A protein has these predicted regions:
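Short aromatic/hydrophobic "clamp" motif used to bind/position activated sugar donors
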Residues: 79
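Acidic helix N-cap motif at the loop->helix transition within catalytic regions
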Residues: 16-20, 43-52, 91
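Short, well-formed alpha-helical segments that are part of the catalytic scaffolds
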Residues: 8, 13-27
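Hydrophobic helical membrane-anchoring modules
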Residues: 172-230
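Glycine-rich, basic loop-to-helix element that forms the pyrophosphate-binding segment
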Residues: 58-74
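A conserved acidic beta->alpha catalytic loop
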Residues: 38-46, 86
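Cell-envelope/extracellular polymer assembly enzymes that use nucleotide-activated donors
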Residues: 4-6, 33, 169
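Conserved donor NDP-sugar-binding/catalytic core segment of glycosyltransferases
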Residues: 91-122
Length: 230
């Protein structure tokens, strides 16, 4: 029996790009379904996603809540959670199919290599830092994608409904020895780093991560994370 992959994308006001994203996933030959988890868009994101062929669910704003809602409706044996501003580069299909076909990965999860669509030295330095973080601490973030069997996801209890650090919370439950780095690139938009800076944004992310590990509530962390932004 063929393995079915459900791609789950949390979105908010992505009407300008959602059609192309959905079509790319559906045309990949790997995704059996695409689920757009909308966090209350005030534009035409949801309607356009449906027209493009995606299933659409609505949820409270926040990637944790949105991805959890998407997973509840997924019919796939495997789930791929991935951010709307991330796309997987050529070669990911074979890598993903091999991972899903290996019975040893039934209770494991995979993530892809973090790559920015920026040719600057600062971008390359950040990519190396992310690779080190993943290798040393087993902490991939959501913009690297998370490939996990539906069974294992349910066993872990899924994404928590928290406004920040939902990806960290889940991968900590997966545990480092069950996380595998997949040899395919996840190309992510560098817009956030151009806006916030290649020093300030990673520093703020690291501060939030450290405070989270110290027990600070995500409801407070999200205020720190979004400070100074609209």
């Amino acid at each position: 029996m063929a393995v079915v992959l459900s791609v789950i994308i949390p979105v908010l006001n992505k009407a300008d790009t959602i059609v192309g994203e959905v079509e790319n996933w559906l045309e990949s030959g790997v995704a059996g379904e695409v689920i757009v988890a909308d966090g209350g868009s005030i534009d035409a994101t949801a309607d356009l996603a449906r027209v493009a062929g995606a299933g659409v669910v609505t949820a409270l704003r926040g990637r944790g809540s949105q991805m959890a809602a998407g997973a509840k409706t997924a019919v796939g044996d495997w789930l791929l959670f991935i951010h709307a501003d991330t796309r997987l580069e050529p070669g990911w299909q074979m890598v993903t199919e091999r991972f899903m076909a290996d019975a040893a990965n039934r209770f494991c999860a995979g993530h892809y290599r973090f790559v920015l669509d920026d040719t600057s030295p600062e971008a390359r330095r950040l990519e190396r830092m992310v690779a080190w973080r993943c290798q040393t601490f087993g902490l991939p973030y959501g913009d690297q994608g998370l490939l996990i069997s539906n069974e294992f996801y349910e066993h872990l209890g899924g994404f928590p409904s928290i406004p920040l650090m939902e990806d960290v919370a889940l991968v900590r439950r997966i545990a480092k020895h069950r996380l595998k780095a997949l040899p395919a690139d996840a190309l992510t938009s560098a817009v956030r780093y151009h806006r916030d800076g290649y020093i300030l944004r990673p520093a703020r992310n690291l501060l939030c991560l450290g405070l989270y590990f110290l027990g600070v509530r995500p409801a407070f962390l999200v205020l720190l994370y979004t400070r100074g932004r609209e």
